[in-house]
C-alpha cells in the first residue's frame, strides 16, 4: 500500500490518496502541473513542500530506496556500458541477478547485448531502461512518460508488463500524455 498524506508541492497540488496493491494509475494533467514532481517525490528523489509518503506503513524517508523502480526522463543508463552490463548492474543492486535473462528475452534484446548504450537509438535506450522493470524486483513502479516514442509493438509489451505487475500485487503509477490503453487503469488528475 502506498499512501500520500497532505502531500503538497509548491501550491501545485494537495493530495490525500492511497494506492492499493494490484493497481495501475495514470497521473494526468497539463504540462507543469507537477506529474513528474509527484513521481520523483514518491521515489524519494525530491521532497514535498509538506506532507508525508508512506509505503507499507513506513515513511519513505526511513526505508531503503529499493522499494520502487523509477524510470524518468533521465533513463538511468550508463552510456559507456553495454546493454547486458546495464541490466546486470541494476539487477545486482536489487539482488535479483537471475531476472536479467527474463528481461532480455521479454524485450528481445539478444542481438543488442554487446552494444554500448550510447550507440542505440533513443527508442531502444528507452526499451533497455524499461527492461529494468523485469531485472529489478520491486513492487512499486513509477514511470514518467515512458510510453513516449515507443513503437506500437514495444508499447504493447510495456502495457502487458504493467498489467502482469498489477495482477501479481504490484502498484504502478505512470504519467503520460497518451491515452490510456489499459482498461483497468485508474486516472488521477492533478491539474
Curated annotation (Swiss-Prot):
Bilayer topology: Peripheral membrane protein
Cell compartments where the protein resides: Cell inner membrane
Cellular component GO terms held in the UniProt record: plasma membrane
PROSITE patterns per the UniProt record, alphabetical: ABC_TRANSPORTER_2, CCMA
Lineage top rank: taxon: Bacteria
InterPro entries reported in the protein's UniProt record: AAA+_ATPase, ABC_transporter-like_ATP-bd, ABC_transptr_haem_export_CcmA, P-loop_NTPase
UniProt EC number: 7.6.2.5
A biological process term (GO) from this entry: cytochrome complex assembly
Catalyzed reactions: heme b(in) + ATP + H2O = heme b(out) + ADP + phosphate + H(+)
Pfam families, per database record: ABC_tran
Function: Part of the ABC transporter complex CcmAB involved in the biogenesis of c-type cytochromes; once thought to export heme, this seems not to be the case, but its exact role is uncertain. Responsible for energy coupling to the transport system.
Protein name in UniProt: Cytochrome c biogenesis ATP-binding export protein CcmA
Organism expressing this protein natively: Rickettsia conorii (strain ATCC VR-613 / Malish 7)
Lineage: Bacteria, Pseudomonadati, Pseudomonadota, Alphaproteobacteria, Rickettsiales
Amino acid at each position: 500500500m502506498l499512501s500520500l498524506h497532505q502531500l503538497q508541492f509548491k501550491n501545485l497540488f494537495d493530495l490525500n490518496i492511497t494506492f492499493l496493491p494490484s493497481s495501475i494509475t495514470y497521473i494526468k494533467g497539463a504540462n507543469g502541473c507537477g506529474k513528474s514532481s509527484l513521481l520523483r517525490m514518491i521515489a524519494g528523489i525530491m521532497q514535498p513542500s509538506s506532507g508525508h509518503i508512506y509505503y507499507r506503513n513506513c515513511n519513505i524517508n526511513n526505508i531503503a530506496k529499493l522499494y520502487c523502480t523509477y524510470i524518468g526522463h533521465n533513463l538511468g543508463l550508463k552510456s559507456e556500458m553495454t546493454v547486458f552490463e546495464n541490466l546486470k548492474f541494476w539487477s545486482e543492486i536489487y539482488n535479483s541477478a537471475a531476472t536479467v535473462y527474463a528481461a532480455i528475452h521479454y524485450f528481445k534484446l539478444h542481438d543488442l547485448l554487446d552494444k554500448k548504450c550510447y550507440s542505440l537509438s533513443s527508442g531502444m535506450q528507452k526499451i533497455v531502461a524499461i527492461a529494468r522493470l523485469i531485472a529489478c524486483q520491486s513492487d512499486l513502479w513509477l514511470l514518467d512518460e515512458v510510453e513516449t516514442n515507443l513503437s506500437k509493438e514495444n508499447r504493447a509489451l510495456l502495457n502487458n508488463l504493467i498489467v502482469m505487475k498489477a495482477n501479481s500485487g504490484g502498484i504502478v503509477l505512470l504519467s503520460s500524455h497518451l491515452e490510456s490503453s489499459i482498461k483497468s487503469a485508474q486516472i488521477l488528475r492533478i491539474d
